[in-house]
Amino acid sequence: MKHYFVDTNVVIDMLADREGYADAACELFDAAGRGEVHLSICALSYSTIYYILRKYAGKENAISSLRDLTDYVSILPVDAEVIRKALYSEFSDYEDAIQHYAALQDASVEGIITRNIEDYRYSDIPVLLPTEFHK
């Protein structure tokens, strides 16, 4: 089974039902629910997702969505090493750098799924769009 790290924006696309992006994100998480792929996100993503979802759906719905999310993903830690590597990386987006180095901590991660391919141009592992995970 393929193992992918999912960028925060893709998770938010699904949970916030973002027009134009939600369908591909839902397909990815549906595949995880069927046991066809294994998905991971980093611990830091939870606070970002909560902050954004709370604005759309309120605190209770945001927390409920995050609880449900734990059924679909493994949560990778963000430790001092990840932070240091991200701070000194060539990534233009610091949050993406953190996610990248969190993903690298798990050798079984085969790719990062994001809508922002360009932000991961310095990635050490393959980067895919949400529509490409099943290819």
Locations of regions flagged by a protein language model:
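Active-site-proximal, substrate-binding regions of enzyme catalytic domains
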Residues: 19, 26, 44-48, 52-74, ...
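Short, well-structured N-terminal submotif of metal-dependent ribonuclease cores
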Residues: 1-41, 54-61, 122, 128, ...
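Short, active-site-adjacent cap segments at secondary-structure transitions
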Residues: 12, 47-49, 119-121
